[in-house]
Amino acid sequence: MACGPGDLQSLTSPLSSARLDYQPSIEGPWLRACGQTNVSCRVVKGKLVEVGKWPWQVSILFLGTYICSGSLIHHQWVLTAAHCLQRFKDLSLYSVMVGVHQRPENSTQLPLTRMVIHKDFSNLMSQDIALLKLRDSISWSPFVQPVCLPNIKFKPSIGSMCWVIGWGTTGKKG
């Protein structure tokens, strides 16, 4: 793990050909573009951890309990997996927590106003994608920032380094 005090690590943004229907808001010197991390090291329970490595990661809650992760793509929109939302469509049962690192003390829990599940999603995990709209627009901070979305023609080459993030299990129990 390579941690420096507040190191800003730049990731390439594949958004150059994307069309925006709003004027992006740059709210601080630490937000130059999507996909930016603002890593700092902290000791949590005796272990060195990187805080701010994935500032777009959010926790999706069902009745206040974690069920899935998602990614901030806009001030009011979260991208997630459709299978996380397939059992219940009642928005009042869900919320999103932003700014979560190890513990939720410094995070903000937000209600939703809309859920969009891909029209061709099935339990077979085909088209497993959904969007959640937050009731209120959030402000970017060093630890709450948007992820980049790839260009529609983007196709990673075999052997490309990819990251999967979340708070789920990493293997089967037992």
Curated annotation (Swiss-Prot):
EC number: 3.4.21.-
One GO MF term: serine-type endopeptidase activity
Broadest EC class assigned to this enzyme: hydrolase
Peptidase S1 domain ranges (all copies): 43-174
Gene3D superfamilies documented for this protein: Trypsin-like serine proteases (2.40.10.10)
Entry keyword Hydrolase: yes
Active-site residues, as the UniProt record annotates them: 83, 128
Cystine crosslinks: 68-84
Pfam annotation, one family: Trypsin
Record keywords: Disulfide bond, Hydrolase, Protease, Serine protease
Keyword Hydrolase: yes
Xref: SUPFAM superfamilies: Trypsin-like serine proteases
Domain of life the protein comes from: Eukaryota
GO terms for biological process, alphabetical: proteolysis
Family: Belongs to the peptidase S1 family.
Protein name as it appears in the record: Putative serine protease 46
Species the sequence originates in: Homo sapiens (Human)
